[in-house]
Design a protein with these regions (language model features):
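Conserved ATP-dependent adenylate/AMP-binding module captured primarily in the ANL superfamily
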Residues: 95-125, 226-243, 273-287, 360
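Conserved AMP-binding A3 loop
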Residues: 36-40, 192-193, 201-227
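Structural core segment of the AMP-binding/adenylate-forming
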Residues: 11, 55-56, 83-173, 559
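Conserved AMP-binding/adenylation subdomain of ANL enzymes
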Residues: 224-241, 248-351, 355, 365
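Conserved pre-ATP/AMP-binding loop-to-beta segment of ANL
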Residues: 19-22, 160-205, 212, 235-241
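Conserved AMP-binding/adenylate-forming core of the ANL superfamily
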Residues: 24-71, 75-79, 96-101, 154-157, ...
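Conserved ATP-binding/catalytic segment of the ANL
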Residues: 421-488
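Conserved C-terminal "lid"/linker of ANL adenylate-forming enzymes
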Residues: 486, 511-514, 520, 561-619
Length: 619
C-alpha cells in the first residue's frame, strides 16, 4: 500500500518515487497516436498550473470549473488547482448553456476551462451573463477563439503565466531547470503546508432523475478516507494500466482514477466513450470502471456471434461458457475449490476459446473491472465472470464519494448483490427499506442548499440515499429508487429498473422505459437497436421507407413480442410487460429525457409521450 498523500501534493510525491516511468497514456486532440507522460512531466505541468492560477489571482477556496471531455489537460488542471487550495468543479461535456450558467453562478466560478469547439462556443455565449467569470481557458489548440473575445486564452498560453518557457521534461536536470523558473512556487509550497482535510476539493453537480440540480460538496478528508477504505478491497497497483471509460465528471471515474494514481498505476485517458472498445484493443488495459450498459453490449455482441456460428463452433462456445460459469460462479464465487476434472476442463477452454473472447476486447492482461451506477442483470454478471473477467459489482453515490459497498476480489460473493459495505461506511436500513449512510466518506451536504441538507440528514447524522435495499449475510442488495417504484391500479409494486435490465440484454433493445404507475398493467416504450433491427428487416424481406414505418410493421412487432415473452418467462404475471410501443427515435438529453449520466428522467418521458402511452391502455 502506498503512503497516503493529500491530493494537493500527490502527483509530486509520486514523481519523486516513479520519476520517468509513464504516468499517463493519452492522445492529443485530433490525433490517433497514443503518447505517454512521465510522472516527472505530470508533476511539472501540475506545478505550472498552480503557478498560473496564482498569477490569475485565484485565492484559496475560490472556484474554477472544467467543461470538457476526458483529456490530459483536465488532470493537469484539477491537480494544479488542488495545489493552491482552489476548488475544481467538473461540468459534463454535454451540459447545456443554461446548466453551465446556473453552476457558474451558484459556485461563483472565476475561471472556466473548456475542451473543444462546442464547449468554447457555449462558454463564450454565456460569458456576459456570468459576473463572477473572469477568464476562459481552452484545452484544444484547434478551437477557433472569437476575434472579439479578449477573455479567452489557449491552455499553452495559460501555462506560460506559470512559467515563461514551456519545455518538455526529459530527465531530472530538465525538471530542476524548469522548476527553478516557476515564479510563484514558494507561495505554492506554502499553500501545500496550509492544505487541510476540511477544505473543499470539488463541488459535483448532480442533475438527478427529477431534474433538480444540486452541488455535492466533497472535501480532501473524504477523498483521503475513500482512498484508505477502497485500498483494502480494490487491489489496483503499480503494474496496472487503468483506462478511463466514464467522464471525470462522474464520481465513480473520478474516485477510481485518483485511487489508481495514489497506487502508482498508469492511467489511459480515453476521450470519446464511443471509441472505448477500439481504445481497449489498442492499449490493452488491465482495469476499467464502467456502468453495466457497457457489459450488456459486450454480452449482446458475444451472444450474437455465438448464435451466428456454425454447428461445432457454436457448441464449443456454449460449452466453454458453461464450464466458465460452473468454475467461476458455482465454485469460486462461493469460496469453494473446483474439483480437479473441472479445473482441467476450465484450463483448456480458458487458454483457447475464452482467451480469444478476452483478446477481442483487448483484455489479454485483465485484472479486474469495477461496475456500478445501475442494476446489473444477473445474466450479464454471470457471463462476465464466465469468460474469465473479474467483475467487481458495487454501489455508491456522488454523496458517498463513490463506493459504499463492493465485491471483494478473491472472496465469496453473491450474484445479484452489490457487495459488502466498506469498513468505514456505516449502512443502516430505514423506513421503506431506505439505505441510510454515515461515515468519513459521506458529504457534509449540498452547496448553498440548507433546506435540502436538513431533509437529507436525520438527527443521528445518517444520509438518506433515496435507494431501497436490504442486507443479507453481510451483503447489500438493491431494490429500486424509492421515487421510481410504481404501484399499479391493482396495488402491485413494480421496480422498473430491474425489469428494464432484464430486457436490455436483448440485442434488439437499445433503450427502454417501463410504464406502470396507477395503470392496470405494465407497458413499455422501447427504442430498438436500429442497426440490428434494420439488418433483420432486410434479411426477412421487410420493406420500409423510414424507422417509423419499420417500428409499426406487424412482423417486427410479433418478433419483438416473442423475444420479450421469452425474457419474461420467470417473472410473475403482474410484473410482465403486456403491451409495448417501438419508438422511431432515441430518448435524448436535448429533450430532457436523459440525465448527463444517461439515466431516464421518467417524469419527462411520461409527459413527452403521454399520448403514445395512453394508446397502449385503450381497450
Amino acid at each position: 500500500m502506498q503512503t497516503r498523500c493529500h491530493l494537493s501534493v500527490l502527483i509530486h510525491e509520486q514523481a519523486k518515487k516513479y520519476g520517468s516511468r509513464p504516468a499517463l497514456t493519452f492522445r492529443h486532440f485530433g490525433s490517433e497516436k497514443w503518447s505517454t507522460v512521465s510522472w516527472n512531466q505530470f508533476s511539472v505541468r501540475v506545478k505550472q498550473v498552480s503557478n498560473a492560477l496564482l498569477n490569475m489571482g485565484l485565492k484559496p477556496q475560490e472556484a474554477i470549473a472544467v467543461f470538457a471531455q476526458n483529456c490530459l489537460q483536465y488532470l493537469y488542471t484539477d491537480f494544479g488547482a488542488y495545489g493552491v487550495r482552489v476548488i475544481s468543479i467538473p461540468f459534463y461535456a454535454t451540459s447545456s448553456e443554461q446548466q453551465i450558467q446556473y453552476m457558474i453562478h451558484d459556485a461563483g466560478v472565476k475561471v472556466l476551462f473548456v475542451g473543444e469547439q462546442e464547449q468554447y462556443d457555449k462558454a463564450h455565449r454565456i460569458f456576459p451573463l456570468c459576473p463572477t467569470l473572469d477568464r476562459i481557458v481552452v484545452f484544444d489548440p484547434s478551437v477557433r477563439i472569437s476575434t472579439h473575445d479578449p477573455n479567452a486564452i489557449y491552455f499553452e498560453d495559460f501555462l506560460k503565466l506559470g512559467q515563461g518557457n514551456v519545455d518538455e521534461v526529459a530527465d531530472a536536470s530538465d525538471l530542476e531547470r524548469i522548476e527553478a523558473n516557476l515564479p510563484r512556487q514558494s507561495e505554492v509550497e506554502e499553500l501545500w503546508a496550509e492544505a487541510n482535510e476540511e477544505d473543499l476539493c470539488n463541488i459535483l453537480y448532480t442533475s438527478g432523475t427529477t431534474g433538480d440540480s444540486k452541488g455535492v460538496m466533497l472535501t480532501y478528508g473524504q477523498y483521503h478516507a475513500a482512498m484508505i477504505a477502497n485500498d483494502k478491497y480494490v487491489p489496483v497497483g503499480e503494474s496496472d494500466r487503468v483506462i478511463n471509460f466514464l467522464p471525470f465528471t462522474h464520481i465513480f471515474e473520478r474516485g477510481w482514477a485518483y485511487l489508481a494514481l495514489t497506487e502508482g498505476a498508469q492511467l489511459i485517458i480515453n476521450t470519446n466513450p464511443r471509441e472505448i472498445q477500439e481504445a481497449m484493443r489498442e492499449t490493452h488495459p488491465t482495469c476499467m470502471s464502467s456502468v453495466p450498459r457497457f457489459w450488456e453490449k459486450v454480452y449482446v455482441a458475444v451472444k450474437a456471434k455465438i448464435e451466428d456460428a456454425g454447428g461445432m463452433q457454436r457448441k464449443l462456445f456454449e460449452r466453454a461458457l458453461a464450464v466458465g460459469k460452473k468454475y467461476n460462479i458455482e465454485y469460486l464465487s462461493r469460496g469453494k475449490r473446483p474439483p480437479l476434472h473441472l479445473q482441467a476442463e476450465y484450463t483448456l477452454y480458458n487458454r483457447t476459446i475464452l482467451s480469444l473472447v478476452r483478446k477481442q476486447l483487448g483484455l489479454e492482461q485483465a485484472h479486474f473491472f469495477p461496475t456500478a451506477g445501475a442494476t446489473v442483470s444477473p445474466e450479464v454478471e454471470e457471463f462476465v465472470h464466465a469468460i474469465g473477467l473479474n467483475m467487481i459489482v458495487g454501489y455508491g453515490l456522488t454523496e458517498s464519494l463513490a463506493t459504499v459497498s463492493c465485491d471483494r476480489l478473491g472472496h465469496p460473493y453473491t450474484i445479484g448483490s452489490v457487495g459488502r459495505p466498506l469498513d468505514d461506511v456505516e449502512v443502516k436500513i430505514g423506513e421503506n427499506d431506505e439505505i441510510l449512510l454515515r461515515g468519513k466518506t459521506i458529504t457534509k451536504g449540498y452547496f448553498h442548499r440548507e433546506a435540502l441538507n436538513a431533509e437529507a440528514f436525520d438527527k443521528d447524522g445518517f444520509f438518506h440515499t433515496g435507494d431501497a435495499g436490504y442486507l443479507k449475510n453481510g451483503e447489500l442488495f438493491l431494490k429500486e429508487r424509492i421515487k421510481d417504484l410504481y404501484k399499479t391500479s391493482n396495488g402491485k409494486y413494480i421496480a422498473p429498473q430491474a425489469l428494464e435490465s432484464k430486457l436490455l440484454v436483448d440485442r434488439f433493445v437499445e433503450q427502454i422505459a417501463v410504464i406502470a404507475d396507477e395503470r392496470k398493467f405494465v407497458s413499455a416504450l422501447i427504442v430498438p437497436e436500429y442497426q440490428v433491427l434494420e439488418e433483420y428487416a432486410r434479411e426477412h424481406g421487410i420493406a420500409f421507407k423510414d424507422r417509423e414505418e419499420l417500428c409499426k410493421d406487424e412482423r417486427i412487432m410479433k418478433m419483438m413480442a416473442d423475444r420479450i415473452d421469452t425474457l419474461q418467462q420467470q417473472m410473475a404475471s403482474y410484473e410482465k410487460i403486456k403491451r409495448f410501443t417501438l419508438m422511431p427515435h432515441h430518448f435524448s438529453m436535448q429533450n430532457g429525457e436523459l440525465t448527463n449520466t444517461l439515466k431516464l428522467r421518467r417524469n419527462v418521458i411520461i409527459k413527452n409521450y403521454k399520448e403514445v402511452i395512453d394508446e397502449m391502455y385503450e381497450e
